[in-house]
């Protein structure tokens, strides 16, 4: 009997309340579709999934999403979920491949990928596949499968990999051909104008320019830091005092960082 697949892994996470559409990044992601791969790598709290989820919602191209976890280090499970995510866009893409991926004993997972690659190669329109939280699935076997997919990537497919760490896959050749869009921490940090729009438009805090500049400097544009500061500021009567005291040792920031550390253990 085939192991059931969790359907919720096949949908982009809902955007946070009052999430801001970051037009600068939306435009870069649109332009990245001209290449084969978009690689979004940054530590926790940089809003990677939020940015990509917002972009996918507005993307005119059919888009498949797969949220990965530690269980997907099993190459057969990875291949099964990869197939299911593509089937969520077009059932014919995974026609027969899902049964192969879930068969026990089954063929090597590369066989499943070959089936998918061949079906994708016959597709007329472009398709986007997003692999979120790739760091959880990363390992020698799954990295080899991803490298195989990239090496044999059919023209209609644009692949987006979201990870806290740079995947151990060979990308030099694609980069030399201008086929990779790289988005890292510096790209994902809030620019000064984005900070202003987030605090005073999305969060409706009504801060002065000096207050915004001070908070931007203290968080260094870190999206999670700004989010935590904004939530706390909404409950403060003295914004200036709070901003002066807000650092990485602030209670909410400590809770966030502690949770991230525990999740890595």
Name the predicted role of every residue range.
Residues 70-73, 136, 165-168, 188-189:
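Conserved nucleotide-binding/hydrolysis micro-motifs of P-loop NTPases
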Residues 43:
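P-loop (Walker A) phosphate-binding loop of NTP-binding proteins
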Residues 2, 120, 175-176, 180-185, ...:
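Loop-to-helix "switch" segment enriched in basic
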Residues 46, 50-127, 134-138:
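Conserved phosphate-binding/catalytic loops and adjacent sensor/switch elements of nucleotide-binding enzymes
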Residues 38, 136-141, 146-182:
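Sensor-1/coupling segment of RecA-like P-loop NTPase cores
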Residues 22, 49, 82, 132, ...:
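Generic structural signal for small/hydrophobic residues in well-ordered secondary structure
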Residues 1-29, 95-101, 192, 197:
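Conserved adenine-nucleotide phosphate-binding loops and their immediately adjacent elements
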Residues 185-211:
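Conserved small helical "lid"/interfacial subdomain of P-loop NTPases
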């Amino acid at each position: 009997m085939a192991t059931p697949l969790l359907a919720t892994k096949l949908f982009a996470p809902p955007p946070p309340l009052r999430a801001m559409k970051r037009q600068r990044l939306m435009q870069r992601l649109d332009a990245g579709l001209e290449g084969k791969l978009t690689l979004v790598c940054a530590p926790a709290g940089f809003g990677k999934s939020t940015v990509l989820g917002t972009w996918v919602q507005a993307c005119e191209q059919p888009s498949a999403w797969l949220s990965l976890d530690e269980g997907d280090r099993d190459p057969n499970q990875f291949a099964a979920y990869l197939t299911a995510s593509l089937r969520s866009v077009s059932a014919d893409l995974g026609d027969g491949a899902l049964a192969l991926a879930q068969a026990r004993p089954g063929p090597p997972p590369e066989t499943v990928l070959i089936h998918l690659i061949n079906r994708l190669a016959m597709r007329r329109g472009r398709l986007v596949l997003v692999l979120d939280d790739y760091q959880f699935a990363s390992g020698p076997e799954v990295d080899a499968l991803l490298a195989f997919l990239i090496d044999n990537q059919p023209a209609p497919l644009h692949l987006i990999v979201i990870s806290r760490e740079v995947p151990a896959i060979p990308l030099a050749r694609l980069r030399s051909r201008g086929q990779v869009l790289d988005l890292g921490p510096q790209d994902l940090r809030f620019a000064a104008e984005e900070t202003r729009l987030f605090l005073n438009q999305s969060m409706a805090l009504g801060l002065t320019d000096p207050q915004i500049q001070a908070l931007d400097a203290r968080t260094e544009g870190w999206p999670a830091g700004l989010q935590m500061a904004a939530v706390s500021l909404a409950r403060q009567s003295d914004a200036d005092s709070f901003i002066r005291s807000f650092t990485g040792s602030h209670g909410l920031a400590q809770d966030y960082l502690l949770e991230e550390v525990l999740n890595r253990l």
